[in-house]
Amino acid sequence: YWGFCLLVVAMDIFYKLYQIRQADNEKNLEAEVLEAVEGTKKLMIDAVTAISQMLDEKDVYTQEHSKRAAEYSKLIAKNLKAHEFTDEEISLIYRSAFLHDIGKIAVPDAVLNKPAKLTDEEYGIMKNHTVWGGQILSGLEFLPQADMGAVYHHERYDGKGYPYGINICLWN
């Protein structure tokens, strides 16, 4: 009888140890997943930074422009009273702004870096960088609205911007 009781107690102890080990494994697995997610986020941020640096190198007239645009975008998002952005939304705006000029990749260097005034035809090509940028960035899950930032970043509140000449109203 006592042997059976000891066996039951031992089995209960082993089962409890198994449960503890499983809980530890789940915690470790959860920590590993979180670490992988953070690593992926860092990789995406590094990729965005590298691409924006490449853009700045291609366009000699706008060195560091992407970084400044991102900093200004973040500052505006933080201080825009009409819409209180979450920290995550501000981070997305910041990262997206780094790539607002990615469409310039498709602009010929002769047009992009021309020291003289652009002809009407060249200016038309240059203006297309917004649409091309939107096409390049469309569908990026980690920057869901970057394509819109690329397309509309030359629009103006008075409707005199491009590519569509729409009015941008910041107040309701």
Predicted regions and their residues:
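General structural signal for secondary-structure boundaries
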Residues: 1, 11-12, 83-87
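Juxtamembrane or sensor-core-proximal signal-transducing alpha helices
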Residues: 3-36
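Alpha-helical transmembrane segments of integral membrane proteins
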Residues: 2-3, 92
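Metal-dependent catalytic cores of enzymes that make or break cyclic nucleotides
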Residues: 45-172
